Amino acid sequence: MLSHVVGATSPPLIEGTIGEALAAAARTWPDVEALVSVAQNLRLTYAELLARVDALACGFLRLGLEPGDRIAIWSPNKAEWTLTQYAAARCGLILVTINPAYQAAELDYTLNKVGVRALVAAEAFKASRYCEMTEALAPEIAASTPGRLRTARVPSLEMVIQIDGT
């Protein structure tokens, strides 16, 4: 008996990574709109998106994140979410998506369960005050040196990156 199901083998799987696919799209359609956020009054072409993604990916690496590290995003749908997703892919980080409806206890569980090293979080969304919940979970944030957070409740968490809300 087979332990797995054999599916269709045609068409073949696409080779490459998500980050490589974005770079290929930017080469093929540099001036075509790739990301539109009406709520943020933002429109980016593939070339502009790739430039912002690569700048963010470089920023993640300069902060000391390394390929294989877990970076979480806790935010409603906004441009920064997409930028974070692609930037994580471009520099080999593992993206952990946190439900924007989660409260502090669920955030605590999620961050600890998967060993998140960095958290990218919006300031707030609807009634959820992400910054306040994060500070309650890791009160050491206020006195920590940027990039050197040490928190008792989430030992793996070293950095919190706040999305400014615009």
What are these regions (language model features)?
Residues L63, C91-T166:
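Structural core segment of the AMP-binding/adenylate-forming
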Residues M1-G16:
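Flexible, non-catalytic linker and terminal segments flanking ANL/adenylate-forming cores
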Residues L22, T84, T134:
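Aromatic/hydrophobic pocket-lining residues that form π-stacking "cages" and hydrophobic walls in ligand
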Residues P11, L42, Y46, T97, ...:
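Flexible, glycine- and charge-enriched loops at secondary-structure boundaries
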Residues P12-A34, A51:
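A short N-terminal helical cap/helix-turn-helix that marks the beginning
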Residues V32-E33, D69, E132, E158:
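Extracytoplasmic/periplasmic beta-strand context in beta-sandwich domains
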